[in-house]
């Protein structure tokens, strides 16, 4: 299923109860202890853990790339700590964010500055060192998902 979390939340359990095996790409089931989080190149042996709910989840895109690259190194050398920088596309924040990027970019050429609404700062021609919401421990949700 490639839907927003609310769609997966509603329909994946229905399909699972009807004995369909659901492979969900949304974020909804990623932290569910009864749903295996699978990266086939890293932990294919956990695929059979889907049987409680008939749902398999996958991590977010940054995590998949990171664990795929680090898995063979970890097996050989036992990695203890990793420092990661990710750069996320504006498109991941949705249509309103894309519209804001377009309008800000256009505004640079016609001397029309707009006030950011989707981001904390102007996004056109910029890199913002922040993604998602802040958690109680001061990290962002994106950092939490990768830890």
Q: What does each of the following model-derived ranges do?
A:
Residues 1-123:
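N-terminal Rossmann-like NAD(P) cofactor-binding subdomain of oxidoreductases
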Residues 118-147:
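Oxyanion-binding "anion nests"
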């Amino acid at each position: 299923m490639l839907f927003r979390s609310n769609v997966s939340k509603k329909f994946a359990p229905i399909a699972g109860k009807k004995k369909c095996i659901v492979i969900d790409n949304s974020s909804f089931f990623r932290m569910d202890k009864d749903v295996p989080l699978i990266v086939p190149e890293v932990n294919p042996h956990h695929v059979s853990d889907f049987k409680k709910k008939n749902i398999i989840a996958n991590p977010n895109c940054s995590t998949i790339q990171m664990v795929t690259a680090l898995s063979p190194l970890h097996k050989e050398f036992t990695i203890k700590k990793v420092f990661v920088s990710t750069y996320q596309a504006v498109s991941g924040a949705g249509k309103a964010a894309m519209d804001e990027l377009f309008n800000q970019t256009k505004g640079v050429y016609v001397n029309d500055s707009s006030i950011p609404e989707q981001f904390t700062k102007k996004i056109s021609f910029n890199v913002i060192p922040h993604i998602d919401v802040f958690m109680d421990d001061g990290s962002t949700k994106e950092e939490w998902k990768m830890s």
